[in-house]
């Protein structure tokens, strides 16, 4: 990306420590994403607008309003037997919890927040029967899904947001 955020620039770092570092390495978009300072990193301005539109579509206009409800499309491809094979038989094998969340919610309506930060915890807005919900799920593909300090911060922030807007949570 083209975005950077830092307190002291690369020139000062170079003069004080002798370390040669680029602006992107010091405070570029990926660095900020991994530090939990931003919600998402996207490739283009159009993708950024799409992400924001999708995110805001799940939130009410204020904390006094209800979240928008959309007409839920019947899920013709709903196959409960897919849930039977979701988890591997090997208890040491990882699995992507996002696959389950996609099946639980309405089709194509999952917006993950802070996907590049604390990847061991998934926080996402979605819909069930057209109603906005917040999904919080451990992701065994990263740190075996264990909650560390970053994941706890990420989850707490997301839960506070859902609470402020009266959006129910699915754990």
Regions found by a protein language model. Give the residues of each.
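Short C-terminal domain-edge/linker segments immediately following a structured domain
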Residues: 28-30, 71-74, 164-168
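Glycine- and other small-residue-rich loops at beta-strand/loop junctions that grip anionic moieties
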Residues: 40-41, 90, 144
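Terminal amphipathic helices with adjacent charged low-complexity linkers/tails
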Residues: 44-101
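Non-catalytic terminal/interface segments that mediate subunit docking, oligomerization
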Residues: 93-171
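Phosphate-binding glycine-rich loops and adjacent basic patches that engage nucleotide phosphates
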Residues: 9-21, 57-67, 114-124, 155-164
């Amino acid at each position: 990306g083209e975005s950077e955020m830092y307190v002291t620039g690369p020139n000062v770092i170079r003069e004080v420590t002798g370390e040669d570092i680029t602006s992107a390495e010091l405070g570029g978009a990926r660095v900020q994403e991994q530090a939990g300072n931003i919600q998402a990193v996207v490739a283009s301005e159009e993708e950024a607008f799409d992400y924001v539109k999708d995110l805001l579509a799940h939130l009410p206009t204020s904390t006094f309003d209800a979240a928008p409800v959309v007409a839920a499309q019947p899920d013709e491809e709903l196959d409960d037997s897919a849930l039977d094979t979701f988890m591997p038989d090997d208890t040491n094998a990882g699995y992507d919890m996002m696959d389950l969340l996609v099946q639980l919610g309405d089709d194509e309506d999952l917006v993950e927040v802070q996907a590049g930060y604390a990847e061991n915890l998934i926080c996402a807005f979605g819909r069930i029967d057209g109603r906005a919900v917040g999904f919080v799920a451990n992701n065994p593909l990263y740190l075996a899904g264990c909650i560390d300090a970053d994941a706890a911060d990420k989850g707490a922030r997301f839960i506070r947001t859902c609470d402020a807007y009266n959006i129910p949570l699915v754990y």
